[in-house]
Amino acid sequence: MTMADVAGKLIDGFVKAFYIAKKDAKVYYFKAPNFTYGFLMPVSLFLAFSIAGQINSALIVSGLTSLVILFATTSIEAVAVVLEKQTGTFERLLVAPVSFFTILFGKALAGLFFGLVLAIAILVPLAVFSGTTIANPVLVLFAIAFSALAFSALGALVSAYAKWVPEAQMLSNFLRFPMAFLSGTFVPLELMPAQLGIIARLLPLTYSVEALRISINDSAPITTYLLDILVLALFSFALLVIAAKVLQRKIE
């Protein structure tokens, strides 16, 4: 197989994934209730910690933006495949010459676009009201995009494993809430006990918060930011590969 053949297959797969993403965006994501839920839980958590005086104002912009991306993308992604398996529409995708990985990548792309829109919708007013100057908007957009892709891939894994919507919702909450408290969203990693700091480095939300904080505040070298983006990309790929294998095993 030549390089041209490989490139052709990659482009063909991406085109198929794009159309799957376009369909999912219309059917699942861009509806008013989804926007509301994407904001509601993260904002509630931050308000609770802010009232208690346990949150540093410098963490609000990056931490809340990351949480909005996490809750918004996983809330829909975690049930999308489950719903399609129950209604029989997922089998229609399998009739086409498309791999399980491509299907899930397309669904994750829809989550990426939705997370990008929601993150910008919360980031801009947060920056204005807090008086925060965004140091590098381009790096912020890349951080949001890779964060949304990683969290969508996590949701895809949950959706591939679950049989029913309540099971998918329970599993996604089981993953989201520990991440929300252990990833430096409310308390900087430097102030955490060493054991919790090690656990935090195993969670994708940690790298999302750190990448956003660096790109917003210019608080660390660019190499740290690039490492965060690389880790988010690796999380995305690994989670999608695992999700594709889980889904294939459960269906076949």
Model-derived features with residue positions:
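Transmembrane helix segments
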Residues: F49-G53, S159-L202, T206
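Transmembrane alpha-helix boundary and packing residues in multipass membrane permease domains
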Residues: F46-S50, L123, A127, A156, ...
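Short, membrane-exposed interhelical loops at transmembrane-helix boundaries
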Residues: T206-A220
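Hydrophobic alpha-helical transmembrane segments of multi-pass membrane transport proteins
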Residues: S44, A58-L126, G155, F174, ...
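Transmembrane helix-boundary elements of multi-pass transport/secretion proteins
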Residues: V6-K9, G13-K16, I20-T87, G115, ...
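Alpha-helical transmembrane segments and their short interhelical loops
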Residues: F100-S172, I222-A233, F237-A243
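Short amphipathic alpha-helical coupling elements at transmembrane boundaries
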Residues: Y19, K23-V27, E91-V95, K163, ...
